[in-house]
């Protein structure tokens, strides 16, 4: 084992005052030569996603001790996207990714920790931890809190998206208020992250593919005992990784990021994965850009039938073989790199050697490669005069990913939702929500409430919604997010007017407004940059330093 980083605070006569503080928190003489390992605990009763994390943190803490390390636990924040959705509070969601990253980096570096075990549940916990891990490059492992089991109502599987869609169904007269309340009371049965292949489960899968969490751990149910066993094993492996000096940046390679993109295409993952993978790769110094997603999409089919657009939830994927089974199918067809390593030091080929090349029979959650749900990936990167830097379209679950229609312009999510619930949006409309980008929001809110209301009203196939904001992992329909440049910095989305004809064509990767360059420049002359919405506090700070979404909306981009 190399010299411990923590020796800076534990060794030598001059560190006697430092050791005195450590003795007060439980260190004894023999502990000062052991690796000090941070346990970044995202436990919170704010959200069901994180309410089960403390038991995992305590299991991991004890396992670190038994393996010969010294754990030091500290807290990280979380924001509940599901609770803040559709409110001003949602502006803090993406911001929380940076706060989580900053807090983990700050605690670990300030205390000269030798490694970190991060534990998270809700959406931004995962990328926040990964950004911190990439910044520090100390031996690290991530423990996912686990997915929630499906809610049940009259034999039907429910998720939190069921509740959002019920609002649209109520306003369009498809259900009554009694049914709405029944869905509300039954869709979230306990602890765990939202149960479809939404953002949290997508990002936990990304971490597993990158090799920084254990095989199968990204699809386990939060309330199952195997999750506790996995937490204990994760701690043991981290202590061993410190001894072997296995560091994150040896695992975070161009090839491993390409593997992660390939897997999220195959499983039907969230649009947010584009933003987060770009951010993590940027921090790791890996050349991954938005065009890599389209390049990989063109050759990778969707082989998992998962909500929001599909039939099953993540616990069903786990029963069918989890991410390792998906990876083995992709490896066998040459779609992922087999030489990437994980935190245990094993290559992809070594880790998957005992897994069959065909998915299990008597299940249809995971399909074979020659019988996909879709022949190409579901996250299309569109470009055109509305998004010269690119944007992300989610096209799973829709029959025709092409729509041309008149623009309906909204300057905020709230205004748009009000119009939808008043039945003002008609088939053929292209709904535009702008000034919701990283700078303009600020914070790039997710538009789950409007999209769910559109789907609930039966317009999911007939209306396109485009925005410089984001979409929840629970969103489906013809939706286009992350439009860059955003409206607040003068992107062309700021210049369009009510009734302008917009084409959204995911087949040809095109998003355009039918205006000449000359007309757009004429409109730009009269455009005024919007004033800052926040003068103080974290949102004000964020809006001043955040990058464009096409670079991951990071806050520490090198100038």
Curated annotation (Swiss-Prot):
Mg(2+) binds at residues 81, 123-124, 446. Keywords: 2Fe-2S, Amino-acid biosynthesis, Branched-chain amino acid biosynthesis, Iron, Iron-sulfur, Lyase, Magnesium, Metal-binding. The modification N6-carboxylysine is found at residue 124. The keyword Metal-binding applies. GO terms for biological process: isoleucine biosynthetic process; L-valine biosynthetic process. It is an enzyme of class 4 (lyase). Its EC number is 4.2.1.9. Pathway: Amino-acid biosynthesis; L-isoleucine biosynthesis; L-isoleucine from 2-oxobutanoate: step 3/4; Amino-acid biosynthesis; L-valine biosynthesis; L-valine from pyruvate: step 3/4. It holds the Pfam family ILV_EDD_C. It catalyses: (2R)-2,3-dihydroxy-3-methylbutanoate = 3-methyl-2-oxobutanoate + H2O; (2R,3R)-2,3-dihydroxy-3-methylpentanoate = (S)-3-methyl-2-oxopentanoate + H2O. The keyword Calcium does not apply. One of its GO terms (molecular function) is magnesium ion binding. Its cofactor is [2Fe-2S] cluster; Mg(2+). [2Fe-2S] cluster binds at residues 49, 122, 194. It comes from the Bacteria. The active site is at 472 (proton acceptor). InterPro entries: DHAD_IlvD/Edd, Dihydro-acid_dehy_C, DihydroxyA_deHydtase, DiOHA_6PGluconate_deHydtase_CS, ILV_EDD_C, ILV_EDD_N, IlvD/EDD_N. Binds 1 [2Fe-2S] cluster per subunit. This cluster acts as a Lewis acid cofactor. Homodimer. Belongs to the IlvD/Edd family. NCBIfam families: ilvD, PRK00911.1. Functions in the biosynthesis of branched-chain amino acids. Catalyzes the dehydration of (2R,3R)-2,3-dihydroxy-3-methylpentanoate (2,3-dihydroxy-3-methylvalerate) into 2-oxo-3-methylpentanoate (2-oxo-3-methylvalerate) and of (2R)-2,3-dihydroxy-3-methylbutanoate (2,3-dihydroxyisovalerate) into 2-oxo-3-methylbutanoate (2-oxoisovalerate), the penultimate precursor to L-isoleucine and L-valine, respectively. This is Dihydroxy-acid dehydratase. It comes from Prochlorococcus marinus subsp. pastoris (strain CCMP1986 / NIES-2087 / MED4). The lineage of its organism: Bacteria, Bacillati, Cyanobacteriota, Cyanophyceae, Synechococcales. The gene is ilvD.
């Amino acid at each position: 084992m190399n010299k411990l980083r923590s020796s800076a605070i534990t060794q030598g006569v001059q560190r006697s005052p430092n050791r005195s503080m450590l003795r007060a928190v439980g260190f004894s003489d023999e502990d000062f030569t052991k690796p000090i390992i941070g346990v970044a605990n995202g436990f919170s009763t704010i959200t069901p996603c994180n309410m089960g994390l403390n038991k995992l943190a305590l299991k991991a803490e004890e396992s670190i001790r038994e393996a010969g390390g010294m754990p030091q636990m500290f807290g990280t924040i979380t924001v509940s996207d599901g609770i803040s959705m559709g409110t001003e509070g949602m502006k803090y969601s993406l911001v929380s990714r940076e706060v989580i990253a900053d807090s983990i980096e700050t605690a670990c570096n300030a205390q000269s920790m030798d490694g970190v075990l991060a534990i998270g549940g809700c959406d931004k916990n995962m990328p926040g931890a990964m950004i911190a891990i990439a910044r520090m490059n100390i031996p690290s492992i991530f423990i996912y809190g686990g997915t929630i089991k499906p809610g049940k109502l009259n034999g039907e599987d429910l998720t939190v998206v069921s509740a959002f869609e019920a609002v649209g169904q109520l306003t369009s007269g498809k259900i009554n208020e009694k049914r709405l309340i029944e869905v509300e009371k039954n869709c979230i049965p306990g602890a765990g992250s939202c149960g479809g292949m939404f953002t949290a489960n997508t990002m936990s899968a990304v971490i597993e593919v990158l090799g920084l969490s254990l095989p199968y751990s990204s699809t386990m149910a939060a309330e199952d005992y195997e999750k506790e066993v996995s937490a204990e094993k994760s701690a043991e492996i981290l202590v061993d990784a410190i001894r072997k000096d296995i560091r994150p940046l040896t695992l975070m390679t161009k090839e491993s990021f390409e593997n992660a993109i390939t897997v999220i295409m195959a499983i039907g993952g969230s649009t947010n994965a584009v933003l987060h993978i770009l951010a993590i790769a940027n921090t790791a110094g890996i050349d991954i850009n938005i065009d890599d997603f389209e390049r990989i999409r063109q050759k990778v089919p969707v082989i998992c039938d998962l909500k929001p657009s599909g039939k099953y939830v993540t616990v069903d994927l786990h029963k069918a073989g989890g991410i390792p089974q998906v990876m083995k199918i992709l490896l066998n067809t040459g779609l992922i790199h087999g030489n990437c390593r994980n935190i245990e030091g094993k290559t992809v080929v070594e880790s998957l050697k005992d897994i069959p090349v065909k998915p299990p029979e008597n299940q249809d959650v995971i399909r074979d490669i020659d019988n996909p749900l879709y022949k190409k990936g579901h996250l299309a990167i569109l470009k055109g005069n509305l998004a010269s830097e690119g944007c992300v379209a989610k096209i799973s679950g829709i029959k025709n990913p092409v729509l041309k229609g008149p623009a309906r312009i909204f300057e905020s999510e709230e205004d748009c939702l009000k119009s939808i619930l008043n039945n003002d949006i008609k088939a053929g409309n292209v709904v535009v929500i702008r000034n919701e980008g990283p700078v303009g929001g600020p914070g790039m809110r997710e538009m789950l409430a409007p999209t769910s209301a559109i789907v609930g009203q039966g317009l999911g196939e007939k209306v396109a919604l485009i925005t410089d904001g984001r979409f929840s992992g629970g969103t489906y329909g013809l939706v286009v997010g992350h439009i860059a440049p955003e409206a607040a910095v003068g992107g062309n989305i700021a210049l369009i007017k009510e009734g302008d004809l917009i084409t959204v064509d995911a087949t040809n990767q095109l998003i355009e407004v039918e205006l000449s360059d000359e007309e757009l420049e004429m409109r730009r002359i009269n455009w005024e940059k919007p004033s800052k919405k926040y003068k103080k506090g974290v949102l004000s700070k964020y809006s001043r330093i955040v990058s464009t979404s096409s670079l991951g909306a990071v806050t520490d981009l090198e100038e």
